[in-house]
Amino acid sequence: MIGFTFGFGSILIVLSAILIASSIRIFQRGEEGSGRTIARFARRYAERTGDAAFPSALQALFDEEARHANDLGRFIDLAGISRLRNEFSDGVFRFMRHRTGLDGALCLLVTAESIACIYYRALRAATSSPLLRELCAQILRDETQHVRFQSQRIALLRGSLPAPVSAARRAAHIVLFAGAAMVVALRHRRVLAAGLGPRRFFRLCRVEWRVVDRLVMGDDAGRPTRHPASHA
C-alpha cells in the first residue's frame, strides 16, 4: 500500500470539480478480485508443464491489483462516496474469464490492463491533486509490468499451436481489444476528454495494442519475465 496522507479537501476538489467519481468507482471495482479462475487455470498449466513458478508469480500480480483496489477504495471512501458492489463491464469480463482457458483469460486480463494504463494517464493529466497523481503513477508502473508479464505468457502458450489456430486467436484478441477500447471511451469520456481527448485516447490504444502484439509475436516473447513482486 502506498503511504499516502489522505486530504479530504483535495479529494472533494478532484471528485466534484471534474465529475469523475463514477469513473473512479468503476475502475476501483475492476481492480478488485482474487483471480481465482485464472489461478485455477495456472495451477493446471503448472501441473501439466512443470512450471511451478508461474502460479506464484501470477498471484503476486493479483496481490498488486488488490493493493490498487484498496488505495482507490480508500480514496473514494474518504470522499464519502459509496463503492460499487457490482458493475456491468466488470461482470462481463468475469463471465468471459470463467468460460475460457488460460490463454483466453490472460487475453482478457492484458486487454483490461493495457487500456487501464491509458485511463490512468488520462486521470493523472486531468487532476491537479498530488494525491491522485501519485496514485495513478504508482498504478501505471505496476500495470506496465503486468502487461509485459501477461503478454509473454500468452506467447509461450501459443508457441506450440498450429499457425492457423494462433492466427485465429490473435484476430479474436484484436476484436476484443477494439471493443474494450470503445466501451472505455464511452463510459469514461469525461476523464478522457479532460486528460487526453478522444483522438489521443484511440491513438494510444493502437500503441498499446502494438506493444502487446509485439511481445506476443516477437523474438523476446519466448523469454518470460518473472513478475518483479515474485522476487521479494
PLM regions and their residue ranges:
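Non-heme di-metal
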Residues: M1-A232
